[in-house]
Amino acid sequence: FISLMKVLPVPMRFAKPGARLLALIKPQFEAGREDVGKGGVVRDEAVRERVCRDVAAWLDGQGWAVQGLTTSPITGPEGNVEFLIAAQRAS
């Protein structure tokens, strides 16, 4: 269970200007333990929204422009709602 904000910095260093990123935001990996319910499911929509905002803001701070964010059509095995985020590295 590792946050995108901990996993992505190393591979992002190798991305050339204009590179594109598509990542799966798994709220149960991004939210604090107090926000994750039984079975690892984040049921609170406000927590899911906060997680998406946090990841988008982090990407922006790393020099990546968020181009889109959408709910994944596939839920996690326990019913977690997950999100796809697209971003492009500044030229």
Task: Annotate the PLM regions.
Residues 2, 28-31, 74-75:
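Conserved nucleotide-binding/hydrolysis micro-motifs of P-loop NTPases
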Residues 25-44:
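Short, glycine-/aromatic-enriched active-site segment of Class I SAM-dependent methyltransferases
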Residues 64-73:
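Conserved S-adenosyl-L-methionine
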Residues 1-8, 49-52:
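Amphipathic alpha-helical transducer elements in NTP-driven molecular machines
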Residues 74-91:
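Core SAM-dependent methyltransferase catalytic element
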Residues 48-62:
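Short alpha-helix
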